[in-house]
From Swiss-Prot:
Protein name in UniProt: Uncharacterized protein YJR056C
Keyword check for Phosphoprotein: yes
A GO-annotated cellular component: cytoplasm
Keywords, alphabetical: Phosphoprotein
Species this protein is from: Saccharomyces cerevisiae (strain ATCC 204508 / S288c) (Baker's yeast)
Pfam families for the chain: TAPR1-like (PF15251)
């Protein structure tokens, strides 16, 4: 990219660097500037001429309309009212065109806000109904008169169905029941299981004490030599 960018400055000149070539280029440059200035001047002149012609054409159109109204036997008051009406129509149309983008943007914003508010209300109503049905607890019906409650009595809670995360498969039902039974018996002070465990521990200790470990006799050097020779014969 740098090489392409530097091509304009690195290209060789088309003419030899002499005084005559430089003077001819200066004359050509000044002539081009004059042509550009004349083109811009001509452009402004044509634009102004067009605007003036448009204004004169509009004025002539207005005069033609007034002459047509006079030829149709219109009174001066009616003609004045007609002129005011046309004037107001033209001014109102120009104002509407200038303010049209702003009004359109405001209208879209208002419509969007109304739609958002309507959607929020539509989502809010069923949620409020569901919450009112699910969480409408009545504590007075279950407890009755709250003034007659004894503080020393522990409250009772009704059993309910456990959630899905707490339910166990059938294969683990027996194991869970036995574990619950042991837990309940232990909580009630049943010492039978504890005695069984302690008795089992004593029996294991007695078995460990009665167990005798026979020590292997230490072999002398002759017997070790005999064993080595026997193993070598077996290998052969």
């Amino acid at each position: 990219m740098e090489q392409m960018h530097s091509l304009e400055s690195s290209l060789p000149p088309e003419q030899p660097p002499t005084k005559q070539a430089i003077e001819s280029l200066n004359l050509e440059l000044s002539q081009e500037f004059k042509l550009a200035a004349n083109a811009v001047t001509r452009l402004y002149r044509v634009a102004n001429e067009k605007n003036s012609l448009t204004k004169h054409q509009g004025y002539l159109t207005c005069l033609d309309d007034i002459l047509c109204a006079l030829d149709s036997n219109v009174t001066a008051d009616e003609l004045r009212a007609w002129c005011y009406k046309r004037r107001n129509d033209i001014l109102s149309n120009s104002q509407d065109k200038s303010l049209n983008p702003v009004k359109e943007r405001e209208r879209k914003l208002n419509k969007f806000s109304e739609n958002q508010h309507r959607e929020n209300e539509a989502h809010k109503e069923p949620f409020e109904k569901d919450s009112a049905v699910k969480y409408n607890f009545s504590f007075n019906e279950s407890n009755g008169d709250l003034s007659n409650i004894n503080e020393n009595i522990a409250p009772k809670f009704r059993l309910s169905m456990p959630p899905l995360s707490v339910e166990h498969p059938p294969r683990n039902a027996s194991r869970i029941k036995s574990w619950k039974a042991r837990t309940i018996n232990h909580g009630r002070g049943d010492t039978r299981n504890l005695n069984d465990i302690t008795g089992l521990g004593h029996e294991r200790e007695r078995d460990r004490e009665n167990t005798h470990y026979e020590k292997k006799p230490k072999l002398d050097s002759d017997s070790e030599v005999d064993i080595r020779s026997f193993r070598q014969d077996m290998d052969l």
